[in-house]
């Protein structure tokens, strides 16, 4: 089933665009001017200069002091396909300059970077290279400075003309799966890009499900429901968008003949895994979790919360399980395939999903379990030990213990009152320090003896810690290597 979205708006005409796109292929790079990790204050010589107001246009051969070392800006050239190896500016920055004959709006499409500065304006990055970052930038007449912090893997960037003054970016949409025979409303989140220099007004979003009639909705508020009429059955899809409009003078109607964006919506049967969208009470955004439903709809079943590993989508996590006759399985997103290791906002997302799903499925809260693999195994430890009242059992698989044991986090030795504050602020991440909370829980630990991704010592340390108060913690070991052992 297709969902078609179109945007009708009133806005003043934009000046003609100059020749775009422009691929960023030649610039300067500097390596080794940052030191991050799980520390309260990462070191960054370039960012320090930006904040201090001393950063200037770099020149080839120019030096930056970083501790006792001196780093040099070096010439940077992209490969034939336009990509730049991440190692070319690992732990550093890449700088490009783009000359424009006039002021204009462009869309920055970049991947593999931690963040960007365009003429000093900070912009979010796409560190894992998903390719969904399409950000409008206001280029000035003359030279424009583009500075990119290093991310993961290869980097590429280009400036493209906006397809319209306002357009949808569907590459990062949060869309539901529709359930056969279900007329309940759903939520969807779609990014609307404003490629102008002013707030827009008079916006109307038109939605149409394949085979149904179109519905127009004005968007004067931050959140707007949109009605969609399906083909054989009536369904409604609520579209969440954030936009504050202000009146504009001298507005002219604008209509685009470009192809309307279409979003693919899956229609799933009652026993199939599916995406369930909801409106988050944390920040008002649309989020989803994946549901692997039990083999029948009887209420009062157990609920399994499954936390995914790094780079795994929640729907893929749910698909990895066979359906259970006795339990529904729910996989939250962590707000992204990487998120923050199920801590902080990842923790909040998991707890919100647990509550939403428990109510919706009428779960037996005395039979709520948490499991997860790799990063999700850490999530199972972290959630299960931090909230032992919510889970009657936990089953971490190939899970690491904490930032201090696995992810390179540094413990701050209290020496002053301020240092002590930061040390205590890190206590929620000290999973091993919470292990006694498992004294009333059932715990099953699964780990590979030769796991070359998460060392088996992580499981053994938790087994010893849990065993200090109890002697019935089972640990299953597989004498194989690789992060997916025992999955």
Residue ranges and their predicted role:
Residues 450-452, 456-487:
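C-terminal catalytic histidine-bearing segment of alpha/beta-hydrolase fold enzymes
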Residues 309, 392-435, 440:
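Mobile cap/lid helix-loop segments that gate and shape the active-site cleft of serine hydrolases
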Residues 175-178, 212-298:
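A domain-start/cap signature at the N-terminus of enzymes
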Residues 14-84, 97, 149-177, 289-291:
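Accessory carbohydrate-binding/adhesion or oligomerization-edge regions at the termini
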Residues 438, 444-447, 451:
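Short beta-strand/loop motif that positions the catalytic acidic residue
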Residues 295-299, 343-375, 385-391, 437:
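Gly/Ser-rich "nucleophile elbow"/oxyanion-hole loop immediately N-terminal to the catalytic nucleophile
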Residues 299-310:
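Short beta-strand element of the alpha/beta-hydrolase
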Residues 100-117, 146-148:
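Aromatic-lined ligand-binding clefts that engage carbohydrates, nucleic acids, or primary amines
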């Amino acid at each position: 089933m297709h969902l078609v979205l179109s945007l009708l708006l009133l806005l003043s005409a934009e000046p003609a665009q100059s020749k775009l796109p422009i691929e960023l292929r030649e610039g300067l790079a500097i390596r080794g001017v940052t030191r991050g990790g799980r520390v309260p204050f990462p070191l960054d010589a370039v960012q320090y200069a930006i904040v201090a107001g001393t950063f200037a246009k770099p020149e080839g051969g120019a030096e930056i002091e970083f501790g006792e070392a001196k780093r040099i800006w070096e010439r940077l050239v992209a490969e034939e396909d336009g990509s730049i190896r991440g190692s070319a500016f690992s732990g550093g920055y890449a700088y490009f300059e783009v000359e424009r004959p006039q002021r204009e709006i462009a869309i920055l499409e970049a991947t593999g970077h931690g963040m960007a500065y365009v003429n000093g304006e900070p912009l979010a990055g796409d560190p894992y290279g998903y390719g969904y970052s399409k950000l409008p930038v206001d280029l000035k007449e003359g030279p424009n400075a583009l500075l990119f912090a290093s991310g993961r893997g290869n980097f590429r960037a280009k400036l493209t003309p906006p397809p319209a003054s306002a357009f949808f970016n569907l590459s990062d949409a949060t869309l539901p799966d529709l359930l056969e025979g279900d007329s309940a409303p759903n939520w969807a989140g779609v990014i609307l890009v404003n490629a102008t220099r002013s707030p827009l007004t008079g916006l109307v979003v038109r939605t149409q499900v394949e085979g149904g009639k179109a519905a127009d909705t004005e968007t004067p508020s931050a959140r707007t429901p949109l009605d969609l009429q399906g083909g054989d059955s009536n369904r409604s899809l609520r579209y969440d968008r954030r936009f504050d409009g202000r009146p504009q003078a001298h507005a002219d109607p604008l209509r685009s003949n470009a192809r309307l964006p279409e979003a693919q919506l899956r229609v799933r049967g009652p026993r199939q895994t599916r995406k369930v969208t909801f409106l988050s009470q944390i920040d008002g955004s649309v989020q989803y979790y994946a549901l692997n439903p039990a083999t029948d709809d009887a209420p009062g079943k157990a609920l399994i919360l499954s936390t995914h590993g790094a780079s795994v989508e929640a729907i893929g996590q749910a698909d990895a399980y066979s359906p259970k006759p006795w339990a529904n399985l729910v996989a939250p997103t962590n707000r992204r395939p990487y998120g923050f290791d199920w801590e902080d906002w990842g923790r909040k997302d998991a707890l919100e999903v647990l509550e939403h799903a428990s109510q919706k499925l009428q779960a037996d809260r005395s039979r709520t379990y948490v499991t997860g693999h790799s990063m999700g195994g850490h999530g199972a430890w972290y959630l299960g030990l931090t909230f032992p009242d919510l889970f009657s059992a936990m089953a971490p698989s190939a899970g690491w213990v904490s930032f201090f044991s696995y992810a390179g986090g540094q413990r701050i030795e209290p020496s002053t009152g301020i240092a002590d504050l930061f040390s205590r602020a890190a206590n929620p991440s000290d999973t091993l320090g919470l292990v006694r909370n498992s004294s009333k829980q059932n715990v099953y630990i699964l780990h590979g003896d030769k796991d070359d991704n998460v060392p088996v010592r992580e499981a053994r340390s938790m087994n010893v810690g849990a065993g200090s108060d109890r002697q019935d913690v089972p640990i299953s070991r597989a004498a194989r290597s690789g992060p997916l052992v025992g999955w």
